[in-house]
Amino acid sequence: MIDLHPNIAPLAPLLGTWAGPGAGEYPTIQSFEYLEEITFGHVGKPFLTYQQRTKARDDGRPLHAEVGYIRVPAPDRVEWVLAHPTGITEIQEGTLTVGGDRITMDVKATTIGLTASAKNVTALARSFRITGDELTYTLQMGAVGQPLQHHLAATLRRTPA
């Protein structure tokens, strides 16, 4: 087993796979429910790997996926570097708070990259709360002429290894 890099030791409780239900809404689409799986891993370097995918709760059709990395450049700071197969990349930066069995991350996009065919996403922000074996998050999005606002929320549980 590769040792965890000391820079990301505060994020060690994230390691593993998390799964559970979520719900989404946005003014330009119908509300929806989904099932999500997130896996956090590491390779011994100063970042976590991140892989996420969702499927529709009603019929299991694939909905979304993203991959990336999480870095801790300072004890109270966190950076997310993500790529979406829909032609979107995002760099999010924000705060990291670790205390006991609780981790809180609040990040906001500082850079969003779009391919020519990607949806016009102009703003993204995420809030993560991890307590023991429960991970909750919300995601806000500004896109297609709409201001930054609530888009997604989910509660995931750690899955057995």
From Swiss-Prot:
Keywords: Heme, Iron, Isomerase, Metal-binding. It catalyses: peroxynitrite = nitrate. It comes from Mycolicibacterium smegmatis (strain ATCC 700084 / mc(2)155). A motif (GXWXGXG) lies at residues 16-22. It comes from the Bacteria. Heme-binding protein able to scavenge peroxynitrite and to protect free L-tyrosine against peroxynitrite-mediated nitration, by acting as a peroxynitrite isomerase that converts peroxynitrite to nitrate. Therefore, this protein likely plays a role in peroxynitrite sensing and in the detoxification of reactive nitrogen and oxygen species (RNS and ROS, respectively). Is able to bind nitric oxide (NO) in vitro, but may act as a sensor of peroxynitrite levels in vivo. Belongs to the nitrobindin family. Homodimer. HAMAP family: nitrobindin. Pathway: Nitrogen metabolism. It is an enzyme of class 5 (isomerase). Its EC number is 5.99.-.-. Forms a 10-stranded antiparallel beta-barrel structure able to accommodate a hydrophobic ligand in its interior. In fact, this fold hosts the heme group, which is located in a wide surface cleft. One of its GO terms (molecular function) is peroxynitrite isomerase activity. Its cofactor is heme b. Heme b binds at residue 151. PANTHER family: PEROXYNITRITE ISOMERASE THAP4, THAP4 PROTEIN. This is Peroxynitrite isomerase 1. Binds 1 heme b group per subunit, that coordinates a highly solvent-exposed Fe(III) atom. Disulfide bonds: none annotated.
